[in-house]
Each structure stands twice: as structure tokens, then as C-alpha cells.
Amino acid sequence: MVRDPKTVILTGASRGIGHSTVSFFSKKNWEVITCSREKPPEECRRDPNWSHHITADLEDGKSLDNFVTEAKELLAEKPLHALDNNAGWSPKSPTQERLGCLNGDLEAWRRVFELNFFAPLKLARGFAASLRKGNGSIVNITSIAGHAIHPFAGSAYSTSKAALSSLTREMANEFADLGVRVNSVAPGEIETAMLSPDTEVLIPRIPLNRLGQPNDIASTIYFLCSEDSTYITGTEIFVTGGQHIL
């Protein structure tokens, strides 16, 4: 008997970690529904397992609600097996500084929290019934910057990710009654376009003495959504090359 493929909804899919995660799940024969502000690369749109991409700005409440509605219409009555909250934002001030406690207006801070913290919560609520049908898994993408002062992240980004780490534990407790597991992955210095040009100076502070690759994160996300992790919930996995232990 051939089983129907499992389905994952993944945000922030147009580049970097999100793009690699889409490819990873597709190669495992999952159906993938994605969301990002930008259209995905052409090679991704040609993937037969990439069932649908919805352009949406999750920072905007109405756009997020429309995404949930459209994605649920695509699911119909089928279960959802995984939700990967990957979308995130670390903006700069007009003077090209990351948003700190003393610089940047509070409206910019609010926008960071809207995407990095509130969007994962809203999406988890929106897809809760579908995830329950699939005994699903939610994976929130946090950051090493949520656990220690980081020279390039900025206070707004770091505190939003710290809040998401805490939210993951609370969600794990509450979603357990639905049979849904909730975990997070905290990347360290991953070689993507989001990296600061000065990140190379941090390599000596990484015990493995190198940058991570997007696939390092994608494979960890997949593990947390697979049958190999059915007794894991409320956990944050650091994929940092050991940077977080120093």
C-alpha cells in the first residue's frame, strides 16, 4: 500500500536556510507548501514536490491571515505533518547599524517582533487543527543570538529570538494535548546572504573552526519532523559548531 506523501508548510522559503530546507524535504518526497515575500528561484518552482508557493508578508496581519486561508484550502481536509517557522528579519537602521537599545525607532522593533515572534505563534494557531490530524511537528528557527550577546545581530533581532525560544517551550506544553510536538533549531554562523561581511572574524570562536552550511540546518529541521524524533518536544537544538558552549 502506497502512503500519501507527508506535507510541510515552510515560511521564508525564497533563499538561504529556507531554500535549502525546501530542497531537503522535497528529496524526501514530502509535499511542500511555501511562503515568502519574494518569489522562489526558478529551479525550486520546477520541483515536482513543491506543490504551491504563496507570496505573503507575514509581518502584515491581513497578509498572514490570507496565507493561512489559502494554505488550508490547498490542504482541504488532509493532515499537515510539519510547520517550519523559518521566516525572520534582522534589519538595519538608516545608518546601516543593526537595531540596538539606543538606536532605531520602536516601530522598527515592533516590526521585527511581528515577523520573528508573533508570526510563528499566529501560524501555529492557524494550522493547529491540521497539525492535530497529522500528529504534526512545529519547528521554530531561533538563533545563537537569542542566548548570548552577538556582535552583528542587534538587540531587536536577538531579543525576538530569545522570546521565540521561550515561546517554543510554552507551545510544546500546550500543543502536547493535540499530539503536536514543538521544538526549535538555533543556528550559529551559517553561510547565507544574511551573514554580516565581518562574520569571518568569528570563526576562531567556533570550536569546529568553520562556518555552517544551510543544509546543516535543513537536516536538523527534517529530523525534528521525522519518525526518528517522536519523543522529542520542547527542545532547542544548537547547530553552531560548538560556538554556543564558549
What are these model-derived regions, one by one?
Residues 143:
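Residue(s) in the substrate-gating loop at a strand-loop-helix junction
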Residues 14-15:
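Conserved glycine-rich cofactor-binding loop
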Residues 129, 173-177, 230:
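Alpha-helical segment proximal to the catalytic Tyr-Lys
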Residues 124, 160, 168:
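Active-site helix of classical SDR
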Residues 135, 176, 181, 232-234, ...:
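Short, small/polar-rich loop/turn modules that mediate ligand/substrate recognition or access, typified
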Residues 94-101, 105-110, 202:
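Substrate-binding pocket helix/loop in short-chain dehydrogenase/reductase
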